[in-house]
């Protein structure tokens, strides 16, 4: 899986309602209320809102071939990309106003139609006909459709925050919920933080290697700066190449410490801020383990579980680099 996938997919604040769900009507009213009461917040901070719910063991039918398949049905109001982990193989995702289209995973498409290129085929879900608009690759058999009922209720919300709210996405999401009174019993998961943390963990090793090479280049320059130009030029050239690599890598991958924005306090005099953030993250991780399982949270938990092993390996490799550099310094040619 592409490392940038984690950063791109976990790019919202997830709300998991613990009660009977949040109605579609109340969501529409909350959005309109937000536009009227605080238009600047809505236009400058809240980028999008997606509501969704899942149904295990939903049955799909090919009415012409009589084939049936059991899937995880996802009913939503908003952007399909913000629901469960998947990659589009053919066709398109269904936009919010299209209540007659659907999206299938490739295995279910083959099971129902005998081919994974099933776009424009018809199927039945709860005796209602739907046209396949897109086929995706997913870890589970899945069927996605936009909600057509005004009385629909959802247990999951995904709030996307604009760049103006970077580092404070969780705070803005909580403020939106408090102002709209959609629910007062929920779990909140800061996907921005976890997505950037997972993304950075894959790149951190390369960043550390480049940093060590840069330190090595500067040290060689200091050693040879009082010697002949013939000895000095290779050190300058090496340092220039390493700096160019760092700048190029930064341009292609972005800030490797973007997840750390969460730990920057709004007021520098707030010395308890860091403790509050750490406690909040601990609570979120504990809540994650007890939430009703869905592919989104399962991927996050699995990724966070492998993260600690990846960080342990990173520490060992970094320690090895340190020992190598230490022994190198002891060599006679390193003495200025």
Enumerate the language-model features and the residues they cover:
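Membrane-proximal extracellular/periplasmic loop immediately following the first transmembrane helix
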Residues: 1-59, 264-288
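Solvent-exposed, non-transmembrane alpha-helical starts
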Residues: 20-26, 67, 98-100, 139-145, ...
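The feature marks short, hydrophobic/small-residue-biased sequence motifs that occur predominantly
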Residues: 45-96
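A residue-level structural signature of the nucleotidyltransferase/glycosyltransferase Rossmann-like core
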Residues: 73, 100-101, 122
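Mid-to-C-terminal secondary-structure elements
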Residues: 78-89, 104-163, 173-180, 189-190
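A cross-kingdom feature of multi-pass membrane systems that activates on extracytoplasmic/periplasmic
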Residues: 162-164, 169-213, 253-310
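Juxtamembrane interface at the cytosolic side of transmembrane helices
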Residues: 208-254, 321-336
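Hydrophobic alpha-helical transmembrane segments of polytopic membrane proteins
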Residues: 313-321
């Amino acid at each position: 899986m592409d490392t940038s996938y984690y950063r791109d997919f976990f790019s919202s604040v997830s709300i998991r309602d613990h009660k009977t769900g949040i109605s579609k009507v109340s969501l529409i009213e909350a959005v309109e209320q937000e536009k009227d009461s605080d238009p600047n917040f809505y236009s400058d901070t809240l980028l999008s809102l997606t509501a969704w719910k899942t149904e295990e063991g939903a049955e799909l039918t090919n009415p012409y071939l009589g084939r049936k398949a059991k899937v995880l049905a996802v009913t939503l109001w908003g952007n399909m990309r913000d629901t469960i982990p998947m990659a589009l193989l053919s066709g398109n995702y269904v936009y919010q106003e299209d209540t007659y289209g659907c999206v299938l995973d490739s295995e279910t498409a083959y099971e129902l139609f005998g081919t994974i290129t099933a776009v424009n085929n018809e199927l039945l879900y709860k005796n209602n006909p739907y046209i396949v608009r897109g086929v995706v690759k997913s870890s589970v058999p899945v069927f996605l459709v936009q909600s057509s009922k005004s009385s629909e209720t959802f247990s999951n919300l995904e709030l996307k925050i604009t760049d103006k709210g970077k580092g404070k996405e969780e705070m803005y999401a909580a403020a939106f919920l408090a102002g709209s009174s959609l629910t007062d019993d929920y779990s909140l998961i800061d996907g921005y933080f976890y997505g950037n943390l997972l993304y950075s963990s894959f790149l951190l090793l390369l960043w550390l290697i480049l940093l060590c090479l840069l330190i090595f280049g500067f040290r060689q320059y200091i050693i040879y700066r009082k010697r002949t130009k013939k000895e000095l030029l290779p050190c300058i050239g090496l340092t220039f190449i390493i700096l160019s690599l760092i700048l190029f890598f930064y341009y292609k991958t972005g800030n490797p410490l973007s997840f750390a924005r969460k730990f920057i306090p709004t007021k520098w005099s707030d010395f308890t801020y860091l403790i509050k953030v750490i406690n909040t993250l601990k609570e979120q991780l504990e809540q994650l383990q007890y939430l009703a399982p869905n592919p989104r949270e399962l991927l996050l938990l699995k990724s966070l579980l492998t993260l600690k092993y990846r960080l342990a390996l990173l520490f060992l490799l970094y320690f090895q680099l340190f020992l190598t550099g230490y022994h190198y310094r002891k060599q006679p040619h390193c003495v200025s």
